[in-house]
A protein has these predicted regions:
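A short linear-motif detector with a strong N-terminal bias
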Residues: 20, 37-38, 75-80
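Polar/charged, Gly/Pro-rich intrinsically disordered segments
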Residues: 33-65, 90-140
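N-terminal "first-domain core" detector
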Residues: 26-30
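Sec/Tat signal peptide C-region and signal peptidase I cleavage site
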Residues: 19-25
């Protein structure tokens, strides 16, 4: 009895480890650990429609980095946020996604923060690319 059970148990364990687990959808006010090891706070996840009728999934998150300088660290962080959101974007059938980096608000009575949007577009071959500012303006 145990001899028959052990191979079956081993097979279940191997398959359980080898099969990819689908990513859970992102939720508002959720803290997410990125592949790079940083953690971010998801501010909102929403579906938006451009004036041209194109639908996209927008993920707004809070970053500790400055969005004003658009440095390499912010670019890498945005790419990591997209990697986390990509399964949800594809599952929901979108061909475009917007990742919105929002600085931590500062101020006591009047608070303010800056934000910067990054647009990702899925090509005909299924690969995702991040649009540059000039490409984004041409699409609109």
């Amino acid at each position: 009895m145990i001899r028959c059970f052990l191979p079956a148990l081993l097979l279940v364990l191997v398959l359980g480890i080898a099969l990819p687990v689908p990513a859970a959808p992102l939720h508002e006010n959720e803290t997410v650990k990125l592949p790079c090891g940083r953690t971010i706070k998801v501010l909102s996840v929403s579906r938006i429609q451009y004036s041209t009728g194109v639908m996209a999934l927008m993920v707004r998150y809070q970053t500790t980095l400055s969005v004003e300088q658009q440095h390499k660290a912010l670019s890498e962080e945005v790419d990591d946020v997209f990697k986390v959101a990509q399964k949800q974007v594809e599952h929901d059938g979108f061909h475009e996604a917007i990742i919105s980096s929002n600085e931590v608000p500062h101020g006591i009575i009047l608070t303010s923060s800056r934000m910067l949007n990054f647009i990702f577009e899925r090509g005909a071959d299924g690969t995702w690319t991040r649009l540059g500012r000039s490409e984004f303006m041409a699409v609109q």
